[in-house]
Amino acid sequence: MSDVTPRSRSLFQVSVAVAVIGVLAAALLNALHYVQEKAERTVMEATVRNMGKGLEIELQTRVIRGRPGSSRELVGANPIQWLESPPEGYVGSCGRERAPGEWCFDVASHEVVYRPRLTASLEFRTAGRRELRWRVGSADETAGGQGANPMATGAIGLVSTTSFVWH
């Protein structure tokens, strides 16, 4: 005779079902975290791209108004001013500590700062960094900083001052 009772068979089936559900839940949570990080990266990249486009519009506006020489005044400016509305999490001038998901403008370094919420796929090339930074600068002053600079000599653009890779 078999020692397996209907009750022990039922407990075994429930145990297997719970284990399968646990594995599936873990996989789904991992996938959700991955998607959330990719969404954060996409929003951050769109915000930076929009700041760059806003700068280009400001530069062209100055040319149209006959003031192309005044473009140099934009070096070190806060590019958030050229967005229709500030990004979610923008707090103005940077404080001492920055919360994850916070954007601010560092008045001392003239850089826009973003502290990512999720960083599992983000690799900072400088040890101890936890934030991303950009600056309105000229090709002349930034050429030595981050490797190959796509801007023409004397051109003004939005450049990253943080060396990072977001996989």
Predicted regions and their residues:
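Short, glycine/small-hydrophobic-rich surface segments
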Residues: 55-90
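Intrinsically disordered, low-complexity regions enriched in Pro/Ser/Thr/Gly and acidic residues
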Residues: 79-167
